[in-house]
C-alpha cells in the first residue's frame, strides 16, 4: 500500500465499530479477518479495522447476544471462527442505523447552518 493510501485512511469514530460489524454480517456469516476485509473494501480502502479492535468487538457483540459464533473452515482451508447475526443483532443494527442517521443530521446542521440573517 502506498503512503498516499495510508494518508487517505480515516479513523473510526468511537461507537461505530459495532454498527459496521453488524452491517457486514447482515450480508452473511463471515470470519473475523473477512469482516475486516469487507469493511475495508466497502469503504474503498478508507477504513481499516485493526485486529486489536476487531476481535474484542466481535467478542463483546457475541457476549451481548447480537452475534453467534461457530467454528468452520476458511477459503484458505484454515480453521476459523465464523460469526453470524442473530435476531437481536438485527434489531440492534436497526437501532444503530437510526442513531447514526440522527447523528449525521445533527452534525450537518452544525457544519452547514441555515442562514440566520446575521452578518
Where are these regions (language model features)?
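Short, Lys/Arg-enriched N-terminal segment that forms or immediately precedes the first helix
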Residues: 1-10
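N-terminal helix-turn-helix DNA-binding core of bacterial DNA-binding proteins
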Residues: 9-53
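Short, structured helix-loop boundary elements
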Residues: 10, 51, 79-82, 97, ...
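A cross-family signal for key residues in well-ordered alpha-helices
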Residues: 23, 37, 59, 94, ...
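Basic amphipathic alpha-helical segments that dock to polyanions
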Residues: 54-61
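Beta-hairpin "wing" of winged helix-turn-helix
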Residues: 62-78, 84
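Amphipathic alpha-helical dimerization/coiled-coil segments
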Residues: 88-119
